[in-house]
Amino acid sequence: MAGRLTEAGRAYTLLEASNRIADSWERHYDRLHLHTIKRYSALPYRPFPASYPTYVAKADLLRYYHDYAATYRIRPRFGQRVIRAVHETGRWRITTQRGDQFAAKQLVVATGFNRVPHRPSWPGTADFRGVVAHSRTYQNPEPFLGRPTLVIGMGNTGAEIALDLSEADVPTYLSVRGPVNIVPRDFRGRPVQQTARLVRRLPHWLGDWIGNRVQAAAIGDLSAYGIHTPRESPARQLRERARTPVIDLGTVAAIRAGRIRVVPDVDRFLAAGVQLADGFHLDVSAVVLATGYRTGLADFLEAPDALSGEGIPRTAIARRGLYFVGFDAFASGLLDSIYRDSERVVRAILSAQT
């Protein structure tokens, strides 16, 4: 957004809760590479350097974001966590944790899906003598070496953290609650993201059929290992429920090889481990909660008509000068959706000023 507004010559104020550029990416685990190809993951007006790999690494991504901020003279007001945004007398009134106040005719919310970690509660958690950490704080396997570790949740983050731990010879367990759609990152030498962009132009039934065939050929039947495939195709899951399938980076091979053991849902915590839904006592000394996030928009944004029951914006362009960027899920990936939404939103902002 900031780059597009700068390019359009539109003045803006950018409030940032943290004290650095790209804070959410800085906090990601060390092994991170984008799951989407660089062609569809860049910011406006500035493609990734040709020297970068197809799937950009964390260090390269951070370098790129800092260069972008310098190029477009993006200077956020750091340490300004918004605690209230309300529309009054024709303007948005914004209050930050510092007590500072701002007013604007137009407000763009770009805090994303992953603003507030979701931490489910289980009976007995207080009795557990081990370590419980949310995936947001996970960096690398070092603190878990020699400690049997349970990862709860098999989304993309949980699958990759389990892989990271297993590759460091940490005894690794992965709790999977229900059926999971898993797709390969690449299939027969081609990024699946590119295939998804082509498939979405087809009738849904045909695209779903192709997705199922690719999934069956690349991933296969994992029911013997405790993972079941849902009836809905990966494309339908994304299309109808905005849920991205798990993009496999090697977790499936580790499961088949026995380096990651899949277990059922957790029923309760014990002093020396957890009790699973099937009654089995699993002896672990560390648990990583890969249990997702919530947007937390309703915590500060007083615009209930703009949000769904799950707290997700209903549309990028709402009423009364309110806009959202980064809350949609295209088949081509979240970063590509941010690129598209930001273009629409800037166009709407500029047209509202004429």
Describe every region a protein language model picked out.
Residues M1-S24, P53-N156, E160-T354:
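Flavin (primarily FAD) cofactor-binding/catalytic cores of flavoenzymes
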Residues P47-P53:
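A short acidic, helix-capping loop that chelates divalent metal ions and anchors anionic groups
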Residues R20-P47, R75:
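Redox-cofactor-proximal catalytic regions of oxidoreductases
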